[in-house]
Amino acid sequence: MNYIDKSEEINVNVGTIFNLINNVDGYKEFLPWCKNSSIESNSNEVIIGEIEISKNLINWKFKTSNKYIIDKKIVLELIEGPFSHLCGEWNFEKKDKFNTKVSLYLEYQFDNKIIEMSLKPIFSSIMDSILDSFISEAFRIKNEQ
């Protein structure tokens, strides 16, 4: 099993960063490795989203169910993709009106060793920088307001 556990306190209000991360459809606009992203459904505080990744000439996609509590939490569970296991959660802790602690915990395992050998280095690289990518975009949005 592989794990990601990251957190950072940022000078962005909780609503801005939560909405950015919860809007799967917008990922393709600012995440360089995201070839496409879409929301299949959004109802009863559950989003079904699909992300297509393209990096180092390798393309793949996966779909997750994202159960959310507005401005608090997003819980991710794999629906389909090259993983035998993928689940995790984003947590948002409002520190004050302008500051938020954002945390990501993710655990994953690829379907088999061949897939793992080709995708793990790419996925690990993406996961190492994902929080920074969302924070950079949140600051861009904040500065435009």
Regions inferred by a protein language model and the residue ranges of each:
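Short, surface-exposed coil-to-beta transition loops
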Residues: 3-5, 59-63, 85-89
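Generic structural detector for well-ordered beta-strands
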Residues: 7-11, 38, 52, 65-67, ...
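Beta-strand/loop substructures that line and gate deep hydrophobic ligand-binding cavities in soluble
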Residues: 78-129
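Hydrophobic pocket/interface hotspot
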Residues: 17-21, 27, 49, 66, ...
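Glycine-rich portal/gate segments that line the openings of hydrophobic small-molecule binding cavities
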Residues: 38-79, 133, 137
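Hydrophobic ligand-binding cavity/cleft-lining segments
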Residues: 1-44
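Short strand-connecting beta-turns/loops that link adjacent beta-strands
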Residues: 13, 42-44, 71, 95-99
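Short, highly charged C-terminal tails/helix-capping segments
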Residues: 136-145
